[in-house]
């Protein structure tokens, strides 16, 4: 299935017009370009990867997945998630906000008796 976007002003949108994406059965949302080259998003992400990520039609769902996935790190929905520290908490807060403001509510993680 091929998706075309009207905005032609940016290189990013020009890229997406030519990307052949498969629709997932679960969400009926196209897979992002990150599925074709995952190492580019998990190592040190470059500016082009961030730009592609921020224009992805799956961005809001990706933001929710990042917040709900334990141990998520790297580039998710255009936001870099560090391994640990305050920067990680800040990035996850940004992703939660992106997801929820765009119609993808984030499930709160339950605290187990062992981790409490």
From Swiss-Prot:
UniProt keyword list: 4Fe-4S, Cytoplasm, Disulfide bond, DNA-binding, Iron, Iron-sulfur, Metal-binding, Transcription, Transcription regulation
Induction profile: Weakly expressed in exponential phase, more induced upon entry into stationary phase. 3-fold induced by streptomycin and pH 4.5, 4-fold by ethanol. Slightly induced during entry into hypoxia, by cAMP, in macrophage infection and 5-fold induced by NO. Repressed by WhiB4.
One GO MF term: 4 iron, 4 sulfur cluster binding
Matching InterPro entries: 4FE4S_WBL, Whib
Manner of cofactor binding, per the entry note: Binds 1 [4Fe-4S] cluster per subunit. Contains 1 [2Fe-2S] cluster after reconstitution of overexpressed protein from E.coli. Following nitrosylation of the [4Fe-4S] cluster binds 1 [4Fe-8(NO)] cluster per subunit.
Any one annotated GO CC term: cytoplasm
Cellular localization per UniProt: Cytoplasm
UniProt cofactor(s): [4Fe-4S] cluster
Entry's Gene Ontology BP terms: regulation of DNA-templated transcription
Stretches assigned to the 4Fe-4S Wbl-type domain: 33-86
PROSITE patterns for this protein: 4FE4S_WBL (PS51674)
Binding site for [4Fe-4S] cluster: 12, 53, 56, 62
PTM info: The Fe-S cluster can be nitrosylated by nitric oxide (NO). Upon Fe-S cluster removal intramolecular disulfide bonds are formed.
Similarity field: Belongs to the WhiB family.
Function: Acts as a transcriptional regulator. Probably redox-responsive. The apo- but not holo-form probably binds DNA. The apo-form has been shown to act as a protein disulfide reductase.
Matches recorded under HAMAP family: WhiB
UniProt-recorded name of the protein: Probable transcriptional regulator WhiB6
Organism: Mycobacterium tuberculosis (strain ATCC 25618 / H37Rv)
């Amino acid at each position: 299935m091929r998706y075309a976007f009207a905005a032609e002003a940016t290189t990013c949108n020009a890229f997406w017009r030519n990307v052949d994406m498969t629709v997932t059965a679960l969400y009926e949302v196209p897979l992002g370009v990150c599925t074709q080259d995952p190492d580019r998003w998990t190592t040190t992400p470059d500016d082009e990867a961030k730009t592609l990520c921020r224009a992805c039609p799956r961005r809001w769902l990706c933001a929710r997945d990042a917040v709900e996935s334990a141990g998520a790190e790297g580039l998710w929905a255009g936001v870099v998630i560090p391994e640990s520290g305050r920067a990680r908490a800040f990035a996850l807060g940004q992703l939660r906000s992106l997801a929820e403001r765009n119609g993808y509510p984030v499930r709160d993680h339950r605290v187990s008796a062992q981790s409490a």
